Amino acid sequence: GIYEPAFRETYQWLTEQKAAEEREIGSAEIAGWLGFNSKEMWNTFLPELDQSYKEQASRMVGDLMVRQIRKHKAVWYPGAEEMLTALKNRGYHLVILSNCKASYREAHWKEFGMERWFDHFYDCESYGFRPKTEIVQEIIREYSGPYLVVGDRRQDLECARACKSPFIGCLYGYGEKGELNGAD
């Protein structure tokens, strides 16, 4: 993956700047932040970190991940493209709502030719890092239902509940046990 190396390089920089104390951070802890928006992630991981460092670290992680995407290091789960093609061929309108930054969205859109499947890719940065439960209300105004939400984190389940939609939970091996309890 591209997130962990980007995070580790950024964390090393924070320790070199004496903004954070050096400590061992396991892969499982790092993976646990996947699906969080950057503000939520840094406020969870290092709530005491000065805001200017949080912003710099967030930019650094994002920039490092975008570089890796452009070097073709990002990969999708096996079968994802085939499933998206099948859904599109059946006439479904597909949109993405991600807690990512705009630069990450743009890099993925271009790298994977996502316009083949998706009508729109919403990123939370473009909405001031508001919660998905708020952003989804804008999607509802733009696209008529019914809706089905597919996701891998608690934020996605909350989003589905906010728009009164069924939810399919995907277990990718990160997140907390029971986080997707209540998935349809």
Where do the protein language model's features map onto the residues?
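N-terminal helical cap/lid subdomain that shapes the substrate entry/recognition surface
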Residues: G1-P78, R90
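Surface-exposed amphipathic alpha-helices with a cationic face
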Residues: E81-N89, I140-R141, L157-R161
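Acidic, Mg2+-coordinating phosphoryl-transfer loop and its flanking beta/alpha structural elements
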Residues: V150-D184
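Conserved phosphate-coupling serine/threonine residues in phosphotransfer and NTP-handling enzymes
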Residues: S98-C100
